[in-house]
Amino acid sequence: MAKVTGLGGIFYKVADTAATQAWYQENLGVGGEWGAMFPFKNDDPEGFTLLSPFKADSDYFAPSGQQFMINLRVDDLDGMIAVLAAKGIEILGRQDEEYGRFAWILDPDGVKVELWQQLGGAPV
């Protein structure tokens, strides 16, 4: 039987695509002609991508007013936070859990971006 094998992309509307792509390139080091592309590798059996709905009244995406949030995997959360803070980007918060370390920022369109350094395997 055919099955879904992973997340193919996140697509959303913004007022100025060039400015948004430039911001992601300059501040997070991701981007290109078609946006941020991440090669699919399956060399880490513990790695995973999550598609997760939130309740309509959840405040987890705050202070963004958007109906979605982008989660980006990082390999060094402390290093990423230092780079972003040096560029004047506000770090909205930090949190460490047994399954990962998190920090949050807003992109220039007001979209909340969750930076995630995975610790351990997928939750059971």
Language model region names:
Residues 28-66, 106-108, 112-120:
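Conserved short beta-strand elements that form part of the metal-binding/catalytic scaffold
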Residues 1-12, 29, 33, 81-124:
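Vicinal oxygen chelate
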Residues 37, 71, 102-104:
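Conserved hydrophobic/aromatic beta-strand scaffold that supports enzyme active sites
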Residues 63-88:
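Mid-chain, well-packed structural core segment of small domains
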Residues 2-5, 11-52, 86:
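Core segments of cupin and vicinal oxygen chelate
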Residues 9, 59, 66-69, 99:
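Generic anion/oxyanion-binding catalytic loop in active/binding sites
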